[in-house]
């Protein structure tokens, strides 16, 4: 299995003077969707208990960036004037700022079955547009001067929802409505505001080829309207695109060639295994009932087979004894610093390839978010003493990788 032991030098990679704005205008945070937060009180409690503890251990006193997750309910409660003012004062008092919001999960995200409901409402439904607008209204008032703001969202829909042509058309129009809204709000506030569709296996947008095709459909709705290039892009989740067996360099170049903005990059790792009988048995510890853990199997001839969930992959018959084994890449977010052992691997090479591309082209993306939301459902052997310990080690690993590529803390 995977060990929580650090896959880095704990001396060379210690986090003693880190702030979360890096050179070349890069911003780095961890996504607070790792903590429970179904209403604002629970969200704020997580910030007070966990985020401040992480900040105390990784920041030397410079401005500390927060990647905020807000459910629909939490966002409605936060916009109440007294509550919002109190949060602004809390940020100021703690020398913290918000530059990005995770607007993917609309409702409950911890403690009960989520699975396909994480994609609902999708972009064919008015609730998704209303929720996303509200998130941007919140973000625009939280952003420091001169800092751009991003929100990540569902990849249009989930393929198994089987949306009708009318519903597909409605999704296109609602995304354009959001572009209109962001253009007006950006003009009003002076902030560069952009929404990122987050490709994910088995969704409307699974990979960069599907992203390019979908953005062509969007542009065909309003030929010549270039505002889409500024306000709508892709939230590139390294775990998700690695599961699709994409080459980082080719995937990023494909998006760039199509004029699609990289709104944000999720720094995340997936599981990668050869499904021997022993590995299949061990994988049952990851086949839990809250989140989808899609599996994409690359067979020995290079063809890809998609499984909706890890349970489904484990239910398939194993290859005959002695037959070549396929590779399974599994949608289970693994701590960035986890060290492979016992036949388990991660897709960290994909993440490193993305950072190499950013190093070669620093203007590629400015927003980076570590996203390992699976803390509560990880097998016990993977967990460290506390979620704060995990996050601190993820910061250390990530900042070391940025430093190797010349990106240093500012402040």
Feature-to-residue mapping (PLM):
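Non-catalytic accessory regions flanking glycosidase/transglycosidase catalytic cores in CAZymes
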Residues: 15-96, 233-235, 397-411
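Acidic (Asp/Glu)-rich catalytic clusters
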Residues: 19-23, 48-65, 79-104, 139-146, ...
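Hydrophobic faces of well-ordered beta-strands that scaffold small-molecule active sites
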Residues: 26-32, 62-68, 98-102, 149-153, ...
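Active-site beta-loop-alpha junctions enriched in small/polar residues
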Residues: 31-35, 69-73, 103-106, 154-158, ...
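Acidic/histidine-rich catalytic cores of soluble enzymes
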Residues: 182-318, 325, 334
